[in-house]
Swiss-Prot record:
Tissue and organ expression note: Present in medial edge epithelial cells at 14.5 dpc (at protein level).
Species: Mus musculus (Mouse)
Composition bias, Polar residues: 301-311
Protein name: Transforming growth factor beta activator LRRC32
Classification via SUPFAM superfamilies: L domain-like (SSF52058)
Membrane topology note: Single-pass type I membrane protein
Gene designation: Lrrc32
Domain LRRNT: 22-49
Amino acid sequence: MSHQILLLLAMLTLGLAISQRREQVPCRTVNKEALCHGLGLLQVPSVLSLDIQALYLSGNQLQSILVSPLGFYTALRHLDLSDNQISFLQAGVFQALPYLEHLNLAHNRLATGMALNSGGLGRLPLLVSLDLSGNSLHGNLVERLLGETPRLRTLSLAENSLTRLARHTFWGMPAVEQLDLHSNVLMDIEDGAFEALPHLTHLNLSRNSLTCISDFSLQQLQVLDLSCNSIEAFQTAPEPQAQFQLAWLDLRENKLLHFPDLAVFPRLIYLNVSNNLIQLPAGLPRGSEDLHAPSEGWSASPLSNPSRNASTHPLSQLLNLDLSYNEIELVPASFLEHLTSLRFLNLSRNCLRSFEARQVDSLPCLVLLDLSHNVLEALELGTKVLGSLQTLLLQDNALQELPPYTFASLASLQRLNLQGNQVSPCGGPAEPGPPGCVDFSGIPTLHVLNMAGNSMGMLRAGSFLHTPLTELDLSTNPGLDVATGALVGLEASLEVLELQGNGLTVLRVDLPCFLRLKRLNLAENQLSHLPAWTRAVSLEVLDLRNNSFSLLPGNAMGGLETSLRRLYLQGNPLSCCGNGWLAAQLHQGRVDVDATQDLICRFGSQEELSLSLVRPEDCEKGGLKNVNLILLLSFTLVSAIVLTTLATICFLRRQKLSQQYKA
């Protein structure tokens, strides 16, 4: 009897499908995938090919999911129903899809309608991934909705209204590896809530309301995101033989007062504790009785045994450590000595007044060190330290007088940012410079140097000799005197030169010799002329804004025609006539000149015009008018002289005749 009923249903289904083939199918089918997203559909289409394996219905207006017509597509493996208005799931609707592996129900209304009264999702034996994010699920609604899914590996319950996780919340899904719970309001996680997930490796609990992590015992976990909570303490209470696999831990934007307990995580390679309230103590606790004393600044500190072998130290494998945006005033040497594998260290935006790395082979693998936005007054680096350091960020501190070879001792340094300090460079061997200056010559690895805003008064000759810089920023040093030969040695390497806002009236730099220079910024100075580029160079961008240029003669700019792509000229008293080279660039479009409609030039002594509107004949007419005026003035002057001479002669003759008559 049952076979006859199934046969009848199959015949009815086939007949219905055939009869509806004449209707226009709104979806596009490619390789057994039906693409129906964003079509404004009110129900699941019933006229699709019966052998489709993927059905994408996101971004429609579906409210109910019924066995018919969804049950027609028994070969479905991937079903996307996200971003609809679904509030009703007919009982057994997904059981009609025996091969279903991926189900996306994100951003619907499963918590507001009858979806939960139908028995939830039911048993889905082959389901691998399930997305229920953004459905306002709360309380025990999740438990009622979730069914038995023995093969489920990825589950998302993000962006819901969960406040608590119970021990039995995740029963029936023992294979889950990735669990996303971000953006809920979780305040409590019952002990053993994750015991039903023995294979869990990735757990996202970010953007919740958790205040404390205690008795952490998820040994198999590899990635844990606890960012954007209100966590004040992170502690573990592992079993004696526990072997934790945690490699990635994110605790940023919490309320941690102390460095977290990491003693049980020997495989940790990434740690982010930025945006907390962390302070590091001046030294390590001395007695074993103080090893777990938060009042000393250590929270079950992993650093409390300095005699431990570095290779077995819990932080010895750490590659990335972010401590930015905290309240750290001092980094003790004992904190750094075991970070033997660390490659990236961010200590920016703290309260550091000094930083020391004196111990030989300290931080041997560090590639990037960010100490920017502190109040650093002292930087002491010993010899043979930071041997792999390539990038050092020191901008916006209070550095003033440093040992002269502070940076020359860094064997691999490539990028150095000193913007916003008070550092003065020494000169070359012939001009060593004043006390407290820093030597930037003879650093063969350094390529990028930023010394903007350092209140430098003098840049001496040979300041960067034998240092192959490609980028040099000397901007915002008002009153800077660039001595002749200050940039000598950079002619073959320099590609970017920034000299903006220095008040320069004369530029004693032979720019045409810098054959690889691609970007030159001379804005906001008082320059009125440039050296002549008579041969082809590589300059692509030239910024001359807010200077005193009136003319850019072709004999000086001709060498730039093959390379120059962009020219900035606003804020200069340009002359409308005599700028034939510039006018040619505007009209021919060979160079992109900024704001050509607003680029104003002076025509004569008073009249101002848009440079793009000036034509050569305008200047010729202006020239003829000037010639005519000069001729008229000359004729008038000559006439006046002749008349004056004649009048004088007549007067003298009359006077002579008068004297003769009297005689």
